[in-house]
UniProtKB/Swiss-Prot annotation:
This is 2,3-bisphosphoglycerate-dependent phosphoglycerate mutase. One of its GO terms (biological process) is glycolytic process. It comes from the Bacteria. The active site is at H8, E86. InterPro entries: His_Pase_superF_clade-1, His_PPase_superfam, Phosphogly_mut1. It comes from Neisseria meningitidis serogroup A / serotype 4A (strain DSM 15465 / Z2491). Its EC number is 5.4.2.11.
Length: 227
């Protein structure tokens, strides 16, 4: 069995080195090109999908659409879920990473970005950019909508969707594409690869590059590689 992850192509805020999180940012021109190249590469290597899962953020949805279109598979059903959203960076969202490091120190920013269990400063619920005010989350209970997350909380959010939707799809024989975000994919990778809390800090998933997992019948990783 195989599973393919793809992190969305470069976003406009990736290009500007800003914290993005749940802010809905478009793909940059480079990001659009990365998604198209990924779709072509998947087609060239014979990858076909039966279902695709993505987040409710534009940059991931757009990447998923482009990948499927470029691989002549735009007909493949897509399921969009907030559970595959990027990690919520709290009050850091929209801030310049370099300027934030100058203010708080490189080590503090590294911990906020990469540690497993350290939360960022939380966003106020009445902030104009709070997810509580975004209608795409209107169906969710208020206490479920995050104001800031670490990777541990992100995994706790993503894992129920893995167990309820993604894993059963794979086990039923479906060929699955997951088009999501750096940290939601890091969380899934931690789970399926059994990566330790310490080692996950060093895991980077590049934008727009298909990551293939070969899995056994228990969804244990046999092999992983980038196309």
């Amino acid at each position: 069995m195989e599973l393919v992850f793809i992190r969305h192509g470069q976003s406009e805020w990736n290009a500007k080195n800003l914290f993005t999180g749940w802010r809905d940012v478009k793909l940059s021109e480079q990001g659009l090109a990365e998604a198209a190249a990924a779709g072509k590469k998947l087609k060239e290597n014979g990858y076909e999908f039966d279902i695709a899962f993505t987040s409710v953020l534009t940059r991931a949805i757009k990447t998923c659409n482009i990948v499927l279109e470029e691989s002549d598979q735009l007909f493949v059903p897509q399921i969009k879920t907030w559970r595959l959203n990027e990690r919520h960076y709290g009050r850091l969202q929209g801030l310049d990473k370099k300027q934030t490091a100058e203010q708080y120190g490189d080590e503090q920013v590294r911990i906020w970005r990469r540690s497993y269990d350290t939360l960022p400063p939380l966003l106020d619920k009445d902030d104009e950019f709070s997810a509580h005010k975004d209608r795409r989350y209107a169906h969710l209970p208020a206490d479920v909508i995050p104001d800031g997350e670490n990777l541990q909380v992100t995994l706790e959010r993503v894992l129920p969707f893995w167990e309820d939707q993604i894993a059963p799809a794979i086990l039923s024989g479906k060929r699955v594409l997951v088009a999501a975000h750096g940290n939601s994919l890091r969380a899934l990778a931690k789970h399926i690869e059994g990566i330790s809390d310490e080692d996950i800090m060093g895991l980077e998933i590049p934008t727009g590059q298909p990551l293939v997992y070969k899995l056994d019948d228990n969804l244990k990783v046999i092999e992983k590689f980038y196309l």
